[in-house]
Amino acid sequence: MKFLFSLSALLIISHFAHAQTTQRARDLGIPFDGIPGKYNAITDVPGVMVGFKTLISGSGKLVEGKGPVRTGVTVILPKGKTNDGYPAAWFSLNGDGEMTGIPYIEDYGMGYGAIGITNTNSVGIVKDAIGSWNVKHFSKGEFVDYSFGLPVAAETWDG
């Protein structure tokens, strides 16, 4: 029993010790153009805006259909509150996941407006919300109106 306790303690301690010494790519000598900004964050890039909403409801053991809930959405505006285009590409690491707007990105190598990141089951509503926001802010009310565009919304795992 003492052996199992000692082994468990050693594994836990080594995990935290490793987590605190993990180096970043730059620390390992991997070269990148430029230098990190003040916060080393996407918001250091001039013109980029990021917003998020985290939903936390309930506590304790997970009861399917009841909670607790830990989820949210992040929205990135690469060109701020404009509908200006920006270079875009996409990549699938494991072939599992949902993302809207891929055909346009593949065909033109461009994105327009906001990028949403949320849980799997909310990709559709986030895409629709981005489209509605685009219409509200960029529509000129013309017969042909491209302001809804092809919003990009992608999933990330909430777990």
What are these regions (language model features)?
Residues 1-20:
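Bacterial Sec-dependent N-terminal signal peptides
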Residues 20-159:
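Alpha/propeptide regions of enzymes that mature by internal proteolysis
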